[in-house]
């Protein structure tokens, strides 16, 4: 057989650092034949000999091999140096620089809103809501100032929530009416990735219009599209006035929808959802969210539809077994599911053990990343399992859903005696099983 060169991928942990302050790097060598001689690491030009794990080779279905290595190193040891992975076979040498992958930084949009003067008078307190929208990464710090001085009470900041890969949060300040109408200036400060944004509001100001409502439409999840007969579209209307009406249409045909969240004393947002058939969504039909109110000259409309996919590529799925030395020496083991070569980027990964769903808290999926050709994507999932469960012969399956897969779902199953993973197309009966485990 003709020798095949190794294709190298650089990987890094989902979090910027582990709990002990260390960083985890991964080197994945794929599609090579015959076997490689070694995988080594270097910091600049100096060899690294500690903190390494070398995993066994896996023979792929097409006769080539996959092998990986993991490096654990502290942030101070890395410093400003470059980390390289080197793969050698005879006189052939392949080198990959492992780049930092903290992800794109998306600064938040910060919006400050207040309760009406009528509400303040009747309730005897004012509510100010600081909305922090669409930021990445997750870590933020929210603080409040009163006439430029830090406040240590009177406000509550909600936990962040994730929507489509970015994060949002709110912080609510409650002020007695007497203080609010005393010409005091309140400031919401949001610190994110070394940048601080400030928004001010003055208590004596008479509330007035703060602009038209803003509409944001959210598509259904890929898991819902692949596994369910109906899917849910979501319309988020921020800056919504009291008494706003939100409705849905398909072209000009009205649809039955539900209001999930109404505007109240601590929010100016309305969330409306509508359930449609999966077939209608896949057809590319246009769906409209319509916002109307007596203060709007004409209703506001926003539309959403499934984008046409011109480059459909089926994913290649492989599972990397734990190293033999870990099986006998560690209390917990890791299984890695690599999914690559797919397009479009929408995909989901789950794990099952003995055909039962694994708690999502036991595994982590990376962000979807572009491959070298920028036309296909890859993602990997790391499952943590107890060594005694692995030793008992339990079967673990990486379940992958993508629209390019003929039956929409495939899995790869391994156990301690399987030697090498088996590739399985899930039957329609198993689809029902997976769906029932949502």
Swiss-Prot record:
Transmembrane segments: none
Keyword annotations of the record: Glycoprotein, Immunoglobulin domain, Repeat
Glycan attachment points: 166, 200, 245, 275, 374, 411, 415, 425
Keyword Repeat: yes
Gene3D superfamilies in the record: Immunoglobulins
InterPro entries attached to this UniProt entry: Ig-like_dom (IPR007110), Ig-like_dom_sf (IPR036179), Ig-like_fold (IPR013783), Ig/MHC_CS (IPR003006), Ig_C1-set (IPR003597), Immune_Resp_Modulators (IPR050380)
Pfam families: C1-set
Family matches, as SUPFAM superfamilies: Immunoglobulin
Residue stretches making up the Ig-like domain: 5-101, 108-202, 213-305, 315-415
Keyword Repressor: no
UniProt protein name: Ig heavy chain C region
Species assigned in the record: Heterodontus francisci
UniProt lineage: Eukaryota, Metazoa, Chordata, Craniata, Vertebrata
């Amino acid at each position: 057989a003709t020798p095949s060169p190794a294709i190298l991928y650089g990987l890094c942990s989902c979090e910027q650092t582990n709990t002990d302050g260390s960083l985890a790097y991964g080197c994945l060598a794929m599609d090579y034949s015959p076997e490689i001689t070694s995988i080594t690491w270097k910091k600049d030009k100096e060899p690294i000999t500690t903190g390494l794990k070398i995993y066994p080779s896996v023979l792929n279905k097409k006769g080539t091999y996959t092998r990986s290595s993991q490096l654990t190193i502290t942030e101070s040891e890395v410093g400003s140096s470059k980390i390289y992975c080197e793969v050698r076979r005879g006189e052939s040498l392949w080198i990959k620089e492992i780049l930092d992958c903290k992800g794109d930084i998306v600064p938040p949009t910060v919006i400050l809103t207040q309760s009406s003067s009528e509400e303040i008078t009747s309730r005897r307190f004012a509510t100010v809501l600081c909305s922090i929208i669409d930021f990445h990464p997750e870590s933020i710090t929210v603080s409040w100032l009163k006439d430029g001085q830090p406040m240590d009470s009177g406000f509550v900041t909600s936990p962040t929530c994730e929507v489509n890969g970015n994060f949002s949060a709110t912080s609510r300040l409650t002020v007695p009416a007497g203080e609010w109408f005393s010409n005091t200036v309140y400031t919401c400060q949001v610190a994110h990735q070394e940048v601080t944004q400030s928004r001010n509001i003055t208590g004596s100001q008479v509330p007035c219009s703060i602009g038209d409502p803003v509409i944001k439409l959210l598509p259904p999840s890929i898991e819902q599209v692949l596994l369910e007969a109906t899917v849910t579209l979501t319309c988020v209307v921020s800056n919504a006035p009291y008494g706003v009406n939100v409705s849905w249409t398909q072209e000009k045909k009205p649809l039955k929808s539900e209001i999930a969240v109404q505007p109240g004393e601590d929010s100016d947002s309305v969330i409306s959802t509508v359930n449609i058939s999966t077939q209608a969504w896949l057809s590319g039909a246009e769906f409209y969210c319509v916002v109307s109110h007596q203060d709007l000259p004409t209703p506001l409309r926003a539309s959403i539809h499934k984008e046409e996919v011109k480059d459909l590529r089926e994913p290649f799925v492989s599972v990397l077994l734990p190293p033999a030395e870990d099986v006998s020496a560690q209390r917990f083991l890791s299984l890695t599911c690599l999914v690559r070569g797919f397009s479009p980027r929408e995909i989901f990964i789950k794990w099952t053990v003995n055909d039962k769903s694994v708690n999502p808290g036991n595994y982590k999926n990376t962000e979807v990343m572009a491959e070298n050709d920028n036309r296909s994507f890859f993602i990997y999932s790391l499952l943590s399992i107890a060594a005694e469960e692995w030793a008992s012969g339990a079967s673990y399956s990486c379940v992958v859903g993508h629209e390019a897969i003929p039956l929409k779902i495939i899995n790869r199953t391994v156990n301690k005696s399987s030697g090498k993973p088996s590739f399985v197309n899930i039957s329609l009966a198993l689809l029902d099983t997976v769906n029932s485990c949502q």
